[in-house]
Amino acid sequence: MRPSKKAPPGTVLALKPSPALQIKPNTTVAEAAQLMAAKREDCVLVTDDDDRIAGIFTAKDLAFRVVGAGVKARDVTIEEIMTKNPLCAKTDTSATDALDLMVRKGFRHLPVMDENHDISGILDITKCFYDAMEKLERAYSSSRKLYDALEGVQAEMGSSQPQQIISYVEAIRQKMSGPTLESVLTGLPPVTVSVRTSVKEAAALMKENHTTAVLVQDQGSITGIFTSKDVVLRVIAAGLDPATCSVVRVMTPHPDFAPMDMSIQSALRKMHGRPTFVAWWGDNAECMLTIGRWPLPESAGHERSRRDCGHGRCPEAYLCHA
């Protein structure tokens, strides 16, 4: 990866892509999992002999295409199960266009290349969302101080509060509140397993239900949560056998819960820097939904931008295949 240069405002480079973990196609899935665990990453880029992007491999791929399919991680190479020739953004791509694409296509990760097709890094939409929220919170704090100062002047001099300031502060406040967790409810119950369920069976259920997390129950009560990232870090990287290892050994116990009226931004803030997902409860103490870091910014993103190119493909002007 080349040294970073000053990022033009409004571009993908300004989003500060993270350094990409890179591996070769002939690496076994077991070896890749160990590397991902050592680096605490859930996504790697696969590069060819010229160090150009040949594919992308994620924790979800390992859970769905390897463990969930009953394939042994030590017997299969990354090349056999990676997503080949992934869509990539260029460093000078519009940041808005790149994020819109990630939301529209359901990508959590998007590789970034420079004008010479060398790897510049990788975008993680959850990190982008956290960064945007921090900027919005700083803007709100500054605007609120100005609002309070003007309110003090109004009290002393009897003047009315400038409508522009009132409108600006209110607009930022509304953006920060955003949609609630209830808005992402699908009406479908969360996927559950027992403490005795094997990792292989849990991964197969994830694949079947198109989810990256399952709730673990013991005698009718939720006792833990198990995710695709756990499959990588706690099972395959540790050399455990998914067919004989029960989820109770490798789950995250006592997951956090949140009410359905919590805002998506608040939920993301609650999960920031933590490996667990959050389960939400309805008014009758019923588990309504389990969701991870990715679907939340996706849902919030849909609230902010519903643009679509009309044909479901990205404009070649700003995105390209590796």
Regions found by a protein language model. Give the residues of each.
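Tandem CBS (Cystathionine beta-synthase) repeat/Bateman regulatory domains
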Residues: M1-A322
